């Protein structure tokens, strides 16, 4: 029996990237310059001049009647109304996509106001929708920061997963002499790596294969996410590559607390089974105890001695991380409250040099509670109750030792 594949039915998952506003358009241009393959690029903006500089194959002017091509003036409500005016054009451009990345800079007018509208349209079309946005620098002012926070909150309601890049962290990872364009390229690399990584997962066949269905399982309706790629060579290559992939210094979240992880390892013919195990162990230890890891491996002879690790982690919830970190403390308190009091001070915790130099010395309120003796174990000396002495010993002391040695019964005779 012969089987045939109809390429007209499904030619693979369609991925589209739309940059909204000035920041989003710049990110798309840099991705095109980096020759990212397997995706379609779209740029949408209220500013006609910015659209003229776009390298995307599809450009959309947002709100031509409302803004007349002059931009949103840093007002998110203007960007929102412009996107609503151009909803039909956006819908036509996004239609047919299986996965849509929406990238924008938060805090301004067009990106902040229009990105949530674009995300809503993408979700209505049934596409897996991922937002990748930047939060402005603190020195850009509190008003811009407030606009960004509001825009991120609205966007999060309309996307499956969201990656937030903190511009403030650029100041921590780049040198003071680093040119501005190069610094912003570092932020755009987060988007580029995520898009390229997912595109490669879907299009490149693997020995243990991953497909778009796996990507959808990990990313659909999962909230905050982390995406990263790490490449390394040498003896500890898989360890170094995995740590790079899960440690993105620009993202506002970490893999700690992730519930779903898609892990793909690509290497040459010398890649071993134990290296795949090491990568999986590192990811599992960094995430939650019950993390679901979907593992894929690919052999690429062109990799040589290098190994590339791609990680997509989702379901990251800050409140879960807080509950997880506070749980051991509560358990310790419960255990200590049920334990029997121990008075052997040799078992006390050693005192550090800092505690020894403290004005409180080695006093510890936790030990104080434990070493305080119970009332029933205390022996009271008669001297403590002199005022209740019925024999009136203070008066008899002056009468001499002989009289003290005589019992009161005979002295009364």
From Swiss-Prot:
Query: PROSITE patterns recorded for this chain?
Result: FTSZ_1, FTSZ_2
Please note every region of biased composition (Polar residues). Answer: 328-341
Query: Which Gene Ontology cellular-component terms appear in the entry?
Result: cell division site; cytoplasm
Task: Determine if Cell division is one of this entry's keywords.
Answer: yes
Region (Disordered) residue spans: 318-344, 374-413
Classification via HAMAP family: FtsZ
User: What is the similarity comment for this entry?
Assistant: Belongs to the FtsZ family.
This protein's name: Cell division protein FtsZ
Which organism is this protein's natural source?
Enterococcus hirae
Gene name?
A: ftsZ
């Amino acid at each position: 029996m012969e089987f045939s594949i109809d390429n007209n039915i499904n030619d693979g998952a369609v991925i589209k990237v739309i940059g909204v506003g000035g920041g989003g358009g710049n990110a798309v241009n840099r991705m095109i310059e980096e020759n990212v393959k397997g995706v379609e690029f779209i740029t949408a903006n209220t500013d006609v001049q910015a659209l003229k500089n776009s390298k995307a194959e599809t450009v959309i002017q947002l709100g031509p009647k409302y803004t007349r091509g002059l931009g949103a003036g840093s007002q998110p409500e203007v960007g929102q109304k412009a996107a609503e005016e151009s909803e039909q054009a956006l819908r036509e451009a996004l239609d047919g996509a299986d996965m849509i990345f929406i990238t924008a800079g938060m805090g301004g007018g067009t990106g902040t106001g229009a990105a949530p509208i674009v995300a809503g349209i993408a979700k209505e079309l049934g596409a897996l929708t991922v937002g990748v946005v930047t939060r402005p620098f603190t020195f850009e002012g509190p008003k811009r920061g407030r606009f960004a926070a509001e825009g991120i909150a609205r966007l999060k309601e309309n996307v499956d997963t969201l990656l937030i890049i903190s511009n403030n962290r650029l100041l921590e990872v780049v040198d003071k002499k680093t040119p501005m364009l190069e610094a912003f390229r570092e932020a755009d690399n987060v988007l580029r790596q995520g898009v390229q990584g997912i595109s490669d997962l879907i299009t490149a066949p693997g020995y243990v294969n991953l497909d778009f269905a796996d990507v959808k399982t990990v990313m659909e309706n999962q909230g905050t996410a982390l995406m990263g790629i790490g490449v390394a060579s040498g003896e500890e290559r898989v360890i170094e590559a995995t740590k790079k992939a899960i440690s993105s210094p620009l993202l506002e979240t970490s893999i700690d607390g992730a519930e779903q992880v898609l892990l793909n390892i690509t290497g040459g013919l010398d890649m071993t089974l134990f290296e795949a195990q090491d990568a999986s162990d590192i990811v599992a230890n960094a995430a939650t105890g019950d993390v679901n890891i979907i593992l894929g491996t690919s052999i690429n002879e062109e990799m040589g001695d290098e190994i590339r690790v791609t990680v997509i982690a989702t379901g990251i919830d800050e409140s879960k991380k807080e509950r997880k970190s506070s749980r051991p403390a509560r358990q310790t308190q419960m255990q200590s409250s049920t334990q029997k009091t121990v008075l052997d001070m040799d078992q006390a915790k050693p005192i550090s040099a800092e505690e020894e130099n403290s004005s409180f010395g080695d006093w510890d309120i936790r030990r104080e509670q434990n070493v305080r003796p119970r009332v029933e174990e205390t022996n009271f000396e008669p001297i403590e109750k002199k005022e209740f002495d019925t024999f009136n010993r203070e008066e008899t002391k002056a009468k001499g030792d002989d009289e003290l040695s005589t019992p009161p019964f005979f002295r009364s005779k």
